[in-house]
Amino acid sequence: MTILADDGEIELSSWWVENDLSQPTIILLHGVTSSKFSPDILLPMGMFNKSGFNILAIDFRDHGESTCEDGFYTAGQDETDDVVAAISWLKDKGVKSSNIGLYGSSLGGLVALMTPAKSDDFGSIAVIDPPVDFKTLVREEMAYQGLPTFLWEPIYHYAGIFKGVNMLKDIPEEALAKGNLSL
């Protein structure tokens, strides 16, 4: 099935497993370069389903079977819009905000932690291994790849100028504070 985001410009490939709409619903959020087909999503999906939860698994934009804008991810900046669209879709089905939970792994965890900056229409967040300090994460990844870490600054500016992405906007601590949540 498909959920529309960004005024219908983005089609999010999704799986919906309905058990009982009066019970909690979990939105499963995958990691970078992954999809809803990932074991990091399929395993919890099976466990949540067996426990009677409703489940919505989405492919973020530029991932899996969803619309590919440019093949890049935006460190949660645009991916949070995908989650907001998924929440809206659930609410249109009659799911109460308090019954909606976000479960994210890696990038999905980061996106879950950043979602309160754009929506508070959900009741809980559970994350596995989210990168919460993006600047440190990028520097460590650059060092791991054998690149000089001083290149962080030009990359940061490039992302802002050419992609319109502010990688330090709505970092998890700030996003959670907007939703009166703590890390």
What are these regions, as identified by a protein language model?
Residues G104-G108, A112:
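Gly/Ala-rich beta-loop-alpha elbow adjacent to hydrolase catalytic centers
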Residues M45-T67:
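Conserved alpha/beta-hydrolase
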Residues Q23-G31:
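Short beta-strand element of the alpha/beta-hydrolase
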Residues V32-M47, F60:
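The serine-hydrolase catalytic nucleophile loop
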Residues G94-S105:
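Alpha/beta-hydrolase fold nucleophile elbow
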Residues T2-D7, L12-W15, K163-L183:
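Serine-hydrolase catalytic core
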Residues M114-N166:
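Hydrolase active-site cap/lid region
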Residues Y73-G94:
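Alpha/beta-hydrolase active-site loop
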